Amino acid sequence: MTTQDELKRIAAEKAVEFVPENEYIGIGTGSTINFFIEALGKSGKKIKGAVSTSKKSGELLARYDIPVVSLNEVSGLAVYIDGADEVNHALQMIKGGGGAHLNEKIVASASEKFVCIADESKYVSRLGKFPLPVEAVESARSLVSRKLLAMGGQPELRIGYTTFYGNQIVDVHGLNIDQPLTMEDEINKITGVLENGIFARDAADVLILGTEEGAKVIYPCQG
């Protein structure tokens, strides 16, 4: 039986095919992305540079001599490669288990194409089993938590974690996310919320799943 890490590697290696040469690209954060950076580094493909969404990804890119640039230095990105904690048939996602979802949304929105890579366990019919991360300013944490509770969720402060921007993460369990786009917007309207981990407005254009049968390329609502 193929291990989860092996499935992640299968998806990551396939994703290298979606990277155009001599372009700037965006790189996400997480264990699957670590496999992708390794595969890209070993592929011999030449890119102008990569915008990283986290320090860890940036350090790994540098290890493979892939130039790391700031989003402010480029006019746009050809493709954004990132993983997901959950992804549905419309390629809407929950992301942010690593706490970098604000940066990830910024870079995704600057990219012409979003390629999501994941092992097959992340492909779900409905979002919400994975806790939804919500980034909030510290002074509004209690207010934000009460609002999320009123929406039907069970908020839990991520203890001992501070985001890149110095904010806190509230992980919300048990939300009914039947309409991801609406839920994403409603949560972001709460005063004190910087961003939440629903990627419906910035859904993926392509999903590459690592499966027991190999890499499977999926487009929105293909099923």
Curated annotation (Swiss-Prot):
Instruction: Please provide, alphabetically and separated by semicolons, the GO molecular function terms listed in this UniProt record.
Output: ribose-5-phosphate isomerase activity
Q: What class of enzyme is it?
A: isomerase
Positions with a binding annotation for substrate: T29, G30, S31, T32, D82, G83, A84, D85, K95, G96, G97, G98, K122
Matches recorded under InterPro entries = NagB/RpiA_transferase-like, Ribose5P_isomerase_typA_subgr, Ribose5P_isomerase_type_A
What organism is this sequence from? Neisseria gonorrhoeae (strain NCCP11945)
Q: Which PANTHER family match?
A: RIBOSE-5-PHOSPHATE ISOMERASE
Please give the Pfam families that the UniProt record associates with this protein.
Answer: Rib_5-P_isom_A
Pathway entry? Carbohydrate degradation; pentose phosphate pathway; D-ribose 5-phosphate from D-ribulose 5-phosphate (non-oxidative stage): step 1/1
This enzyme catalyses: aldehydo-D-ribose 5-phosphate = D-ribulose 5-phosphate
Q: What is this protein called?
A: Ribose-5-phosphate isomerase A
Q: Name one GO biological process term.
A: D-ribose metabolic process
A cellular component term from Gene Ontology for this protein is:
cytosol
> Has keyword Isomerase?
yes
Q: What is its EC number?
A: 5.3.1.6
Gene name, please? Answer: rpiA
Q: Which Gene3D superfamilies match?
A: 3.30.70.260, 3.40.50.1360
UniProt similarity note: Belongs to the ribose 5-phosphate isomerase family.
Function description: Catalyzes the reversible conversion of ribose-5-phosphate to ribulose 5-phosphate.
**Statement: the UniProt record of this protein carries the keyword Isomerase:** yes
Sorted alphabetically, the keyword list is: Isomerase
Residues of the active site are E104 (proton acceptor)
Q: Which domain of life is it from?
A: Bacteria
